[in-house]
């Protein structure tokens, strides 16, 4: 199995090769030779960027693991090298509401600090509900929760232009909605953080 760093390097190399090939094809006069050269350069840049990105994300992951220890928040690294925070409903929002609970604020405070230290990342916040209520109500509520989370981060210095939000309602359960405990699992907020590959490629190329 690949380590997180090796996975990041491999992912970055693949993206870099694709970008390099595209750049060579669009901007060059040398046909296939130019494309191959662009792909080779892109692969080198992509490999460096993937390693660099993985290292930065690993640091942020460690910070958030320490900040959320014992809270029920799950901090993981996704297969595509994004940082994922899964926040359960018992610490984030009361039933049927989009107001951030006090326990969630302290987590978001630390999270905002890690985001301002790494300004090249982008953030996706997705709200989820259980199957109680109508689709229209759940879609609206899940979006409002994502929006509340974004606004809280923005008030603590995170540029809102970096943050995308969505409400998926009850459509992506992680447990069968057959018990109160399982419904509570489905009421959650997921936050994904990703390093911008384009920005990192530009940083490496500038060196």
Please report, for each region that a protein language model flagged, where it lies by residue.
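Periplasmic peptidoglycan-binding/anchoring modules of Gram-negative envelope and division proteins
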Residues: 72, 93-127, 154, 191, ...
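Second-shell loop/turn segments in exported
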Residues: 49-53, 92-100, 135-138
């Amino acid at each position: 199995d690949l380590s997180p760093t090796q996975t990041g390097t491999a992912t970055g190399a693949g993206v870099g090769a694709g970008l390099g090939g595209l750049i060579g094809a669009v901007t060059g006069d040398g046909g296939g030779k130019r494309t191959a050269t662009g792909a080779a350069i892109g692969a080198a840049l992509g490999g460096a960027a993937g390693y660099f990105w993985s290292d930065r994300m690993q640091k942020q992951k460690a910070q958030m693991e320490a900040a959320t220890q014992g809270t029920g928040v799950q901090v993981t690294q996704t297969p595509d090298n994004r940082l994922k925070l899964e926040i359960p409903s018992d610490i984030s929002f009361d039933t049927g509401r989009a107001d951030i609970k006090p326990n969630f604020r302290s987590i978001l405070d630390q999270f905002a600090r890690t985001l301002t230290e790494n300004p090249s990342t982008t953030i996706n916040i997705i709200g989820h509900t259980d199957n109680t209520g109508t689709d229209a109500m759940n879609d609206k509520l899940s979006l409002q929760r994502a929006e509340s989370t974004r606004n809280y981060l923005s008030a603590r210095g995170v540029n809102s232009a970096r943050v995308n939000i969505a409400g998926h309602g009850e459509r992506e359960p992680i447990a069968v909605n057959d018990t109160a405990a399982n419904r509570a699992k489905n009421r959650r907020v997921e936050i994904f953080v990703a390093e911008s590959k384009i920005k990192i490629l530009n940083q490496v190329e500038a060196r």
